[in-house]
């Protein structure tokens, strides 16, 4: 089941990115290239893409090699249950922001939210079956998607497996 979910997730994510590129090619910005809002949207896009890259590497450091075999509830996984999806969401919205088209940003945000909500729901069924009461407690105490920095916990040492970064 986990392999099927992963394959499907990757296919859907690629289709979504192609759609965003297509939208970016055909959506016109309402702002001139030197206008403040144009520059602000571009800067916002670059910041989100950088946060995506950092956040995905950071999250992968904690889950790498343990996905579907252990329930990781510390590090970025203590902030929200799906940090990889959250940081990918930031990256995709950031790429859309680089088009400086408000339409592209809105479409990207809604499309990614819809896609990830569906994927997360399917993955949660698998995790509930695999980890039972421990996953129920994780659901009860940890936000699903948007991070809450009040609960951050991290062990003193984390073993990294570089091939998963």
Predicted regions, residues:
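Short, amphipathic, aromatic/basic-enriched membrane-interface segments that mark the entry/exit
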Residues: 72-82
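Conserved SAM-binding loop
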Residues: 80-81, 86, 90
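Membrane-anchoring alpha-helices and their flanking helix-loop junctions
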Residues: 1-74, 89-165
């Amino acid at each position: 089941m986990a392999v099927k979910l992963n394959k499907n997730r990757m296919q859907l994510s690629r289709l979504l990115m192609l759609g965003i590129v297509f939208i970016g090619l055909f959506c016109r910005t309402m702002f001139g290239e030197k206008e403040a809002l144009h520059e602000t949207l571009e800067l916002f896009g670059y910041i989100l893409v950088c946060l995506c890259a950092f956040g995905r590497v950071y999250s992968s450091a904690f889950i790498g090699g343990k996905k579907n075999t252990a329930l990781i509830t510390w590090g970025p996984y203590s902030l929200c249950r799906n940090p990889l999806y959250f940081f990918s969401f930031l990256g995709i919205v950031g790429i859309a922001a680089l088009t400086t088209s408000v339409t592209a940003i809105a479409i990207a945000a809604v499309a990614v939210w819809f896609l990830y909500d569906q994927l997360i729901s399917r993955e949660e069924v698998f995790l509930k079956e695999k980890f039972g009461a421990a996953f129920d407690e994780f659901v009860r105490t940890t936000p699903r998607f948007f991070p809450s920095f009040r609960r951050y916990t991290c062990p003193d040492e984390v073993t990294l497996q570089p091939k998963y970064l």
